[in-house]
């Protein structure tokens, strides 16, 4: 249900505590990713609670990567908790991958606040959430048929 996705990805997500079961995240993002029939989701996120901030980052990165898969493809979504840091990796694989430069700039903190618009708002939010406590966002590609977006959430 789109409303539940938007509440969890962008809002306060009432009904959820400070941690969220990743199965809830998968349940809200999978229909949005696979609904067009051109994109599949490979979910490699272990069970167990994740900080709500990490789940927001994960959901928004999946949506951003999905938008970059112009002709569909596969989204590989993984996450791991290591030494108190949540690592998130989204790998997009498809025949045509295009990431808008302004979205990439928003994700990496290279977009002026005055340039934020509806296309870049999610990236800007993800960057801000990741920066809390010294986290970061990294992007490799698009190159050929793939692109990787990683986040470190502290």
Report each predicted region and the residues it spans.
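Glycine-rich/acidic phosphate-handling loop/turn and adjacent ATP-lid/helix
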Residues: 82-123, 152
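Solvent-exposed beta-strand sheet faces enriched in polar/charged residues
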Residues: 42-44, 78, 140
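Glycine-rich nucleotide-binding loop
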Residues: 143-149
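Conserved short strand/loop->alpha-helix "switch" segment adjacent to the catalytic nucleotide/phosphoryl-transfer site
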Residues: 37-64, 70, 113-115
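Glycine-rich ATP-binding loops of the HATPase_c
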Residues: 134-141
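Conserved ATP-binding N-box helix of the HATPase_c
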Residues: 53-82, 122-132
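Short hinge/gating elements
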Residues: 11-14, 44-48, 106-113
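Conserved DHp (HisKA) dimerization/phosphotransfer helix of two-component histidine kinases, i.e.
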Residues: 1-39
